[in-house]
Amino acid sequence: MALEALNSPRLVEDPLRFNGVEQWTKCKKRSKRSRSDLHHNHRLTEEEYLAFCLMLLARDGGDLDSVTVAEKPSYKCGVCYKTFSSYQALGGHKASHRSLYGGGENDKSTPSTAVKSHVCSVCGKSFATGQALGGHKRCHYDGGVSNSEGVGSTSHVSSSSHRGFDLNIIPVQGFSPDDEVMSPMATKKPRLK
């Protein structure tokens, strides 16, 4: 009886038939075909199924050369021949070679150290930009006109100094009642703090 079971052709479910049905049922779209048309009453024997699989493999071609794994491009350093996975990583690595050898003439990534031509006339400090020098000079004067000649901001400070106060200096907190200016409107109430 065991020999008869081994020699008799076995019935095998068609895996492609069920894959197609699953695709139609997943879409949830109605078809004009009835479900009985989708299901074939024909069941494959094991031999037919194996023959069908061999036909599918034969159609594929089976060339192992055609199935190539997509290799990631590698970028190689021209100096030490190290390889990197990205061009940006190679660029960062090349910068290390430039710093080791003292840089090149065509190296445009490093900032140039220009001669500092803006010199403070009070203390002699030099600055790269005139704006930095102007900000530095504010620490030398206490709201009054500086003694240095040839500074463009001196005339501006002297023209505003006739008012008796400088907006750049923190105001003095203590006022006497005599220093307070009264408003011409008598009905104006004092501001609450």
From Swiss-Prot:
Keywords: DNA-binding, Metal-binding, Nucleus, Repeat, Repressor, Transcription, Transcription regulation, Zinc, Zinc-finger. A zinc finger (C2H2-type) spans 75-97, 118-140. Pfam families: zf-C2H2_6 (PF13912). Gene3D superfamilies: Classic Zinc Finger. SMART domains: ZnF_C2H2. Expressed in roots. Induction: By abscisic acid (ABA), ethylene, salt, cold and heat. Its main location: nucleus. GO terms for molecular function: DNA binding; DNA-binding transcription factor activity; sequence-specific DNA binding; transcription cis-regulatory region binding; zinc ion binding. One of its GO terms (biological process) is negative regulation of DNA-templated transcription. GO terms for cellular component: nucleus. InterPro entries: AZF1/2/3-like, Znf_C2H2_sf, Znf_C2H2_type. It is found in: Nucleus. PANTHER family: C2H2 TYPE ZINC FINGER TRANSCRIPTION FACTOR FAMILY-RELATED (PTHR45988), ZINC FINGER PROTEIN AZF3-RELATED (PTHR45988:SF61). This is Zinc finger protein AZF3. It comes from Arabidopsis thaliana (Mouse-ear cress). The gene is AZF3.
